[in-house]
Amino acid sequence: WLEERGDRGRMQIGPAFKSVSYYEQLMLSIDYWMRYCDFDRNGLPVWNSSDHSGMDNQISRAGRLDEFRYEGVDLACYIYRELRAMELMAEKLGKAEDAKRFRVRAALLADKINTVFWDEEDGFYYDRDEHTGEPVRVKSAAGFIPLWAGIVPPRRAERLVREHLTDPDEFWTEFPVACYAKTEPDYVQGDIRDWGCNWRGTTWIPINYMIMHGLLDYGYADVARELARKTVDLVYKRNEVTREFYDGESGEGLGLKRFWGWSVLAYVMPFECETGYD
């Protein structure tokens, strides 16, 4: 909003029932994660559970309800992007010291993500078990979110794309991207409803959207273009109405029918891919 409209006043006021501005509320939101969800104080917060992560039944990587155990590489990347957004807001609002603090915090977090979550042998970003300090060796699409965050060294990006993302035996299903690698023992397609919606192999459009932009940022335009094409074909051509998520092998739409949430991102992916709009 600030970037496109220049409306600084909106960030400096808040709802009538709040005593703090929207800008201050956004700062508190980020601080919440570090204050209440980083139990070992290493700068990397944990998900409450797979439900909390939004990937409902990825229990093998994010835990069961109220475990508060697994440091999510995706969560850390989301917070990194929020810190960079706060840096931009602070600059627009003339808060130079705030902007500097957000920039420093973002840089420190990016370093932690690349130090703690990256596995050199496998060439992949894994979550971390805060209790044991060990990586959670589950290949989830969450491991590609660092590409979207823009914090992956080029050589690592190449490994992510060539060894994992575009491998048809892992994530590049008939209608990519699978949210779990095919090599995972609990990989499954279809609307199984064992715990919320199925995120253990199916295709979810917001994941594709973020990965596409990560591919563009790292110079993999051909792969990004192919992903955009396959995604819009899946949503628009293979199904009569937009659905909540999709079977990555058959292309069948799953979940809510006539879903007007994140799945509509598919319709703008080809445009954004060709124009670079983000």
Map each language-model feature to its residues.
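Aromatic-rich carbohydrate-recognition surfaces in CAZymes
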Residues: 1-50, 73-76, 80, 136, ...
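Short, intrinsically disordered low-complexity segments
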Residues: 7-9, 60, 80, 100-104, ...
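Short amphipathic alpha-helical "recognition" segments used for binding
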Residues: 7-8, 78, 86, 188, ...
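Extended, well-ordered alpha-helical scaffold segments
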Residues: 9-35, 86-114, 155-169, 219-234
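Extended glycan-interaction surfaces of carbohydrate-active proteins
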Residues: 38-71, 111-203, 236-278
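Short, contiguous, pocket-lining structural segments
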Residues: 67-81, 98-101, 105, 138, ...
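Long, repeat-rich segments with strong aromatic
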Residues: 77, 81-93, 105, 109-112, ...
